[in-house]
Amino acid sequence: MTTVSMRDMLQAGVHFGHQTRYWNPKMKPFIFGARNGVHIINLEHTVPMFNEALAFISNVASKKGKVLFVGTKRAASEAIKESAISCDQYYVDHRWLGGMLTNWKTVRQSIKRLKDLESQSVDGTFDKLTKKEALMRTRELEKLEKSLGGIKNMGGLPDVIFVIGADHEHIAIKEANNLGIPVVAVVDTNSSPDGINYIVPGNDDAMRSIRLYTESVAAAAKAGRGQDLAVQAEQDGFVEAE
């Protein structure tokens, strides 16, 4: 089972919160104290809470569940994309479009358009168009890929969303809440933990911290998927008897 230790978190700087004047009082239970005007997060809480979240994600993946990684802040977007791809899951790393979950029907039509344009770009259709028309379609393709590329193969709503930066991604969290989709989120000292099923109190700005979260979630999803494949193989009679 994927777990993260206190040492891992200390080395990654997970305990450094925001300046005390920007704090959200709802995060008080998770704050150890302050140092040089910066809140220090109590990792005695974060370690078990994050490990509980990892166990939940692993369990979702073991049942063929879909995990959607969400992180559109500049510091998070690269790690979000790479980690999601590494475990064959899904991501939003550029901008959360309002209605991405709650208006899935419309999003699905945009994904269909994206896939149509992808086909046209490789089957020679673009070559038969005027330069201007080809350029317009190329730009449309690039725009759709940027917004929807990470969810184009999701095939339906996710079973859990994993969020870096609860404050920044409040629209995604609200949409998931409206649909009853569980939310795992990293919540810094300046953010509200409301609407989050699995709160991970921690630094949501430092790249080392972000990498620790995303890579751990990817490892948990992979481990869960591995359990699923092992069960499937057993059912198919591929596992030899002792």
Swiss-Prot record:
Q: Is tRNA-binding a UniProt keyword of this protein?
A: no
Q: Which InterPro entries match?
A: Ribosomal_uS2 (IPR001865), Ribosomal_uS2_bac/mit/plastid (IPR005706), Ribosomal_uS2_CS (IPR018130), Ribosomal_uS2_flav_dom_sf (IPR023591)
Q: Does the keyword Nucleus apply?
A: no
Q: Which UniProt keywords apply?
A: Ribonucleoprotein, Ribosomal protein
Report one GO cellular component.
cytosolic small ribosomal subunit
Q: Which domain of life is it from?
A: Bacteria
A molecular function annotated in GO for this UniProt entry is: structural constituent of ribosome
Q: Which CDD domains match?
A: RPS2 (cd01425)
Biological process annotations from GO: translation
Q: Belongs to which family?
A: Belongs to the universal ribosomal protein uS2 family.
Name the chain's protein: Small ribosomal subunit protein uS2
Q: Which organism is it from?
A: Shewanella woodyi (strain ATCC 51908 / MS32)
UniProt lists the gene as rpsB
